[in-house]
């Protein structure tokens, strides 16, 4: 598995956009009633192969979203995109959320639902087939999608692992 480290990507140099995936209102019961808080899942990306996600928690919605964006910028990964799609099929699991992603031919479009769609849009993938199985919890679905995108190996990674040139990889 080719793991792209978030350490060597500088989010300040990227033109990152953000997309809100989910807002959840939480309630803490105290002596005087209920105290409400909010958490927000935000996906950030430049639509050119960089994507990250963040979770923000605060007493106000706007503060939670801002914290989520900041957290997302710290977790940016690089996704290898080949002709608007991914190089190979992936099945990733996080908790009981399972996400299956298949490469598609140009013109197919982004066939994904909910949280997975937000991740793929921000990554800049235009043609892909996906299916979300198991839990539909947005937290775990986003994490499974990111985990899957992080595990993608392109031809350069395979050549590096095998100590072969790009030409030798395609011949074997």
Swiss-Prot record:
Q: Which InterPro entries match?
A: Ribosomal_Su5_D2-typ_SF, Ribosomal_uS5, Ribosomal_uS5_bac-type, Ribosomal_uS5_C, Ribosomal_uS5_N, Ribosomal_uS5_N_CS, Ribsml_uS5_D2-typ_fold_subgr
Q: What do the Gene Ontology cellular component annotations say?
A: small ribosomal subunit
Report keywords, A-Z. Answer: Ribonucleoprotein, Ribosomal protein, RNA-binding, rRNA-binding
User: Does the record's keyword annotation contain Ribonucleoprotein?
Assistant: yes
- Describe its function: With S4 and S12 plays an important role in translational accuracy.
What is the UniProt domain comment for this protein? Answer: The N-terminal domain interacts with the head of the 30S subunit; the C-terminal domain interacts with the body and contacts protein S4. The interaction surface between S4 and S5 is involved in control of translational fidelity.
Q: How does it assemble?
A: Part of the 30S ribosomal subunit. Contacts proteins S4 and S8.
GO MF annotation: an example: structural constituent of ribosome
From the record, give the transmembrane residue ranges.
none
Where in this chain does the record put each S5 DRBM domain? Answer: 16-79
Q: Which family does it belong to?
A: Belongs to the universal ribosomal protein uS5 family.
User: What name does the UniProt record give this protein?
Assistant: Small ribosomal subunit protein uS5
* UniProt GO BP: translation
Q: Which NCBIfam families match?
A: rpsE_bact (TIGR01021)
Q: List the disulfide bonds.
A: none
The organism named in the record is Pelodictyon phaeoclathratiforme (strain DSM 5477 / BU-1)
């Amino acid at each position: 598995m080719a793991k792209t480290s978030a350490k060597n990507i500088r989010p300040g140099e990227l033109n990152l956009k953000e997309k809100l995936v989910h807002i959840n209102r939480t309630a803490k019961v105290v002596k005087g009633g209920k105290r409400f808080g909010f958490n927000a899942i935000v996906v950030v990306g430049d639509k050119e192969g960089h994507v990250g996600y963040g979770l923000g928690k605060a007493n106000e919605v706007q503060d939670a979203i801002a914290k989520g964006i900041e957290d997302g910028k710290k977790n940016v990964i690089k996704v290898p995109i080949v002709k608007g799609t991914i190089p190979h099929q992936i099945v990733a699991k996080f908790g009981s959320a399972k996400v299956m992603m298949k490469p598609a031919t140009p013109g197919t479009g982004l066939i994904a639902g909910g949280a997975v769609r937000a991740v793929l849009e921000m990554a800049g993938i235009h043609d892909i087939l996906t299916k979300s199985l198991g839990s539909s919890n947005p937290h775990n679905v986003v994490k499974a999608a990111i985990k899957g995108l992080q595990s993608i190996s392109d031809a350069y990674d395979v050549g590096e692992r095998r100590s072969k040139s790009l030409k030798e990889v395609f011949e074997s």
